[in-house]
């Protein structure tokens, strides 16, 4: 009976341990966006102000071409860029 209490946690730990050994996600995985401005954030990277997904011909609309990890709110086409970099 006591061994059953430890069997499930042991299996879960083995699964979680194997997930920790996976290769880290590439930093180059980003979304091309056009932003009105890029400002330094408190965390690593830049924050994009009023960013639009796509990043095609940003100069035409007077925006800055950048590459952001995500746009918030999630699923929106326009919003704040998170962990951005200048250029594409």
UniProtKB/Swiss-Prot annotation:
Q: State the phenotype upon gene disruption.
A: Does not affect radial growth and multiple stress responses.
Q: What's the main place this protein lives?
A: secreted
Q: Which UniProt keywords apply?
A: Cell wall, Cytoplasmic vesicle, Disulfide bond, Secreted, Signal, Vacuole
Q: List the disulfide bonds.
A: 30-67, 34-58, 35-51, 68-84
On whether Iron is a keyword of this UniProt record, the answer is: no
First and last residue of the signal peptide: 1-21
Conditions for induction: Under normal conditions on SDAY medium (Sabouraud dextrose agar plus 1% yeast extract), hyd1F is transcriptionally active during the first days and sharply down-regulated from day 3 onwards, leading to a 99.7 % reduction of its expression level on day 7. Hyd1A is the most active at transcription level under normal culture conditions, followed by hyd1B, hyd1E, hyd2A and hyd2C in order.
Q: Where in the cell is it found?
A: Secreted; Secreted, Cell wall; Vacuole; Cytoplasmic vesicle
- What is the recorded function of this protein according to its Swiss-Prot or TrEMBL entry? Aerial growth, conidiation, and dispersal of filamentous fungi in the environment rely upon a capability of their secreting small amphipathic proteins called hydrophobins (HPBs) with low sequence identity. Class I can self-assemble into an outermost layer of rodlet bundles on aerial cell surfaces, conferring cellular hydrophobicity that supports fungal growth, development and dispersal; whereas Class II form highly ordered films at water-air interfaces through intermolecular interactions but contribute nothing to the rodlet structure.
Q: Which family does it belong to?
A: Belongs to the fungal hydrophobin family.
Q: What is this protein called?
A: Class I hydrophobin F
Q: Could you tell me which species this protein originates from? A: Beauveria bassiana (strain ARSEF 2860)
This protein's gene is called: hyd1F
């Amino acid at each position: 009976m006591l061994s059953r209490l430890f069997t499930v946690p042991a299996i879960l730990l083995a699964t979680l341990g194997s997930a920790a050994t996976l290769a880290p996600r590439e930093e180059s995985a980003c979304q091309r966006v056009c932003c009105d401005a890029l400002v330094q954030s408190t965390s690593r990277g830049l924050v994009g102000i009023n960013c639009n997904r796509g990043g095609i011909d940003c100069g035409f609309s007077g925006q800055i071409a950048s590459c952001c990890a995500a746009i918030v709110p999630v699923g929106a086409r326009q919003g704040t860029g998170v962990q951005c970099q200048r250029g594409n």
